Amino acid sequence: MHEDFWQARWARDEIGFHQAQVNPYLSRHWPTLGLAPGSRVLVPLCGKSLDLAWLAGQGFAVLGVELAEKAVRDFFDEQRLIPQVDSQGVFRVYRVGSLEIRCGDFFALSAADVADCRGLYDRAALIALPTEMRERYAAHLSAILPSGCRGLLVCLDYDQTRMGGPPFAVDDHEVRRLLGTDWQVRLLEAPDVLRENWKFLQRGLDRLEERVYRLERR
């Protein structure tokens, strides 16, 4: 999936994946990770998620990574924050206090860039990617994040033959295949939320599970 696809989606404000509130799984399960106050948290493919502001408000240092600069600018505008903007390697960096978003290619992040990250939050990154890119994404996470890093992963699981992605279906088997070697993976909950998501009902789905995982880098 070419980056032009996502740039065009943001340019046209076709961002049905954006949530207008903090994700309830984040607020419910994040405290159970036991991360120390001030820990740095990586949020890949972050868009303009309100979850970034929630994490910062809980006292964490937040490192978001986002390809579309419009999403980054929108985030700070909507939060009524004026960021300091500069360049760091291939990234354009927007920063306010301990909240930082790097605009650029997630795969350009190095282990040195995230060496101090003790947390990971993925609500809509893995499921935004087609099969071959999910392989690359999971491998890159494992390659750059340090041992002991803990986080949450939120996936969708549905019958992919009934609807094309994104968001793509990622079932339990795939999560464990992609991450199980390098991460401890524990399923926290998997509610069927189809009746709460009319647009997916309209597209012919007969189930829509949101699967929430606790991850810890081995």
From Swiss-Prot:
Checking PROSITE patterns in the record gives: SAM_MT_TPMT
Question: Which UniProt keywords are listed?
Answer: Cytoplasm, Methyltransferase, S-adenosyl-L-methionine, Transferase
SUPFAM superfamilies membership: S-adenosyl-L-methionine-dependent methyltransferases
This chain belongs to the protein called Thiopurine S-methyltransferase
EC number of this enzyme: 2.1.1.67
List the record's Gene Ontology CC terms alphabetically: cytoplasm
- Provide the protein's localization: Cytoplasm
> Which organism is this entry from?
Azotobacter vinelandii (strain DJ / ATCC BAA-1303)
According to the record, the signal peptide region is none
Q: What class of enzyme is it?
A: transferase
| Chemical reaction(s) catalysed | S-adenosyl-L-methionine + a thiopurine = S-adenosyl-L-homocysteine + a thiopurine S-methylether
What lineage does the source organism belong to?
Bacteria, Pseudomonadati, Pseudomonadota, Gammaproteobacteria, Pseudomonadales
Q: Which GO terms describe its biological process?
A: methylation; response to metal ion
